[in-house]
């Protein structure tokens, strides 16, 4: 493996695995650097905590200077600063994993000289630094050389190692024309040569965009994050008013409420948990996509994936394997099934096509395993004969198009056994391909070739249906074939004989009904639909236009990945919702846990509400502040990993999360604050 490939592989492992010491150390450093208030203004909850922490620090310093008791003020200040640092740490850890991967990707960039073609007629070239190449210029790349920048192959065909980008060490074929002409800077030509036209300036290549996406330089808040931030700001204002109104009851009851105590109480009541973890949840969602080798251009794309209502899936490669495979051999009347299977096998022994190999595999599964006899003559398939087979010692075996084999055997339609005619018609109606088989000039059966639905696809679609998603299969097949495959795969609907314009129209129709649409594509003709879709997943091996149109890029070029993308998006939304539920439930519980403890001395009637029996008003406040800080640390792993996702209906999911995180959020403060209070009082801290 070359050096760039090793660096890229290390970056992927950094994301796929846990936190390295280097990532954690950098995250801790950045958590303190983010104490700069200019970086906190976008998070009203944590910014409010920063302000109160600063006031608490001033109060503690004033107490020390004035030789007043300062222990309580110092502890409050320390734990309030810890709350801000822990919130910053959550975001820094999430960003740190992406930055580690970005550093590894950056290491894959090589400084190389390109062979710039200056005379197309003679092929004369001059060495030119890669960063000086301009869009539209043509360069030559030969075996063993690194492709210096992104481009489109205009001449030649080569085997290219794309491990530096995709992590897949097996070389792939890239050639001019079609959808396999795009090449990426940083990959290596293994064999042959190509001439390519440069499509990206230095600094805007696919690798540069990967690094920018991973680092999150353009990570703007998503609409849901903005809405949640507004909600948190509103709750912060409500609790500020609630704390200020305590001055009245305090004065009435003769309790002198220290501004430091009120400030600390205010911070314990506002939703600091979700406020501190909100950014981490969004960043971690993008990182989880990167773990499955998918790059998202923004958090908006990930969020949209979680809200998708309609999923458009290409049949070939996504729902089916894309290769016709033998599924059965139907014997002619009077022919034993094993004899028909053996004839089909003999006719396929010299066939190197996927169809021929599938017939051999079908026979092997039936207990037949033969090799081509020594001295046998292979009869290749031609466009004229439309059949292939094997000859050996005067015997012959053939398979091919039904009408071609019938014609070779001199059979008229009326002389074909009814059973075989019915079988041929059934296979054709179901979208399959019938192949007739003959042995020594006698018709012995029919092979059923079909585009096989991938294992587990039907179950995945059932899961998506339970999630409330509508699946639509897109295919160029005729409606009869499309209906048969759609029924077998379990999709909700299909679009047959589809053109790129049909895809675009369908997306607009779905969006017109208020639905969010996801689709994947790789061809230049998919670009309009990818751009129109709310979630457009382009294949890395696809055309440049497709990659630029989509808001996600699948480095593995696996169309089925769109299902995982939707699941990651939903997991991110569920995690955010669960932590929000837990945080708000926490605030409500802390309000009823702390307020009675603060006033129970002056208002004994509140003793009935003081269920926790905290040691003193000071220990109640200090314990709540400590709990408030520690709960952020405790939930960082959940924010990064995400709440475990299950493919169930929205109602069940809501009920489960309310029970687990809502009820848990109500109970946790009572248990946590009481335990901390016992420690605080035992150590004489308050």
UniProtKB/Swiss-Prot annotation:
What family does the entry list? Answer: Belongs to the cation transport ATPase (P-type) (TC 3.A.3) family. Type IA subfamily.
- At which positions is ATP bound? 351, 355, 381-388, 399
User: Which NCBIfam families does UniProt cross-reference here?
Assistant: ATPase_P-type, kdpB
Q: What does this protein do?
A: Part of the high-affinity ATP-driven potassium transport (or Kdp) system, which catalyzes the hydrolysis of ATP coupled with the electrogenic transport of potassium into the cytoplasm. This subunit is responsible for energy coupling to the transport system and for the release of the potassium ions to the cytoplasm.
- The reply on keyword Chloroplast is no
Q: For binding Mg(2+), which residues are annotated in this chain's numbering? A: 522, 526
Q: What is this protein called?
A: Potassium-transporting ATPase ATP-binding subunit
Q: What is the active site of this protein?
A: 314
Catalyzed reaction equations: K(+)(out) + ATP + H2O = K(+)(in) + ADP + phosphate + H(+)
Instruction: Quote the Pfam families the UniProt record gives.
Output: E1-E2_ATPase (PF00122), Hydrolase (PF00702)
Q: Which PROSITE patterns match?
A: ATPASE_E1_E2 (PS00154)
Q: How does it assemble?
A: The system is composed of three essential subunits: KdpA, KdpB and KdpC.
Tell me a Gene Ontology molecular-function term this record carries.
Answer: ATP binding
Q: How does the protein associate with the membrane? A: Multi-pass membrane protein
Record's subcellular location: Cell inner membrane
**Transmembrane spans:** 45-65, 70-90, 226-246, 261-281, 592-612, 620-640, 660-680
Listed A to Z, the keywords are: ATP-binding, Cell inner membrane, Cell membrane, Ion transport, Magnesium, Membrane, Metal-binding, Nucleotide-binding, Phosphoprotein, Potassium, Potassium transport, Translocase, Transmembrane, Transmembrane helix, Transport
Which EC numbers characterise this protein's activity in its record?
Answer: 7.2.2.6
Q: Name one GO cellular component term.
A: plasma membrane
